[in-house]
């Protein structure tokens, strides 16, 4: 039996976090979630490089998504990161600066995010 892909989703918007967690759990992913960058970083450190992909908001309290992505890319360089954001005039520039693999602007369709994940991860 194949092991499901393991995702970490980080967003300070509770509704978005809940919707993403529910959607990807139904899609048979193993989903962990965090309400801010600091909590996300703690989960990453606890799980020790076992995430297949991280989805993070860019604008959050404690540790911004931009800073978090930079940390992830230094500590876990093989882990793809998708940045999601609804703020700023140039979200692509922020995500590129932080070295996100993909960026998605809010609002977005869940199917669009699912497609990006499938593009970044091998089939299970």
For every predicted segment, state its role.
Residues 108-118:
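C-terminal output helix
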Residues 60:
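Receiver (REC) domain active-site loop signature in two-component systems and cognate sites
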Residues 33-53:
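Acidic, metal-coordinating helix/loop segments flanking the phosphotransfer/catalytic sites
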Residues 11, 57:
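Active-site residues of response regulator receiver
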Residues 36-39, 64-68:
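Acidic catalytic/metal-coordinating carboxylates
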Residues 14-32:
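Two-component/phosphorelay signaling modules centered on CheY-like receiver
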Residues 67, 87-104, 115:
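Alpha4 helix (beta4-alpha4-beta5 surface) of REC/receiver domains from two-component response regulators
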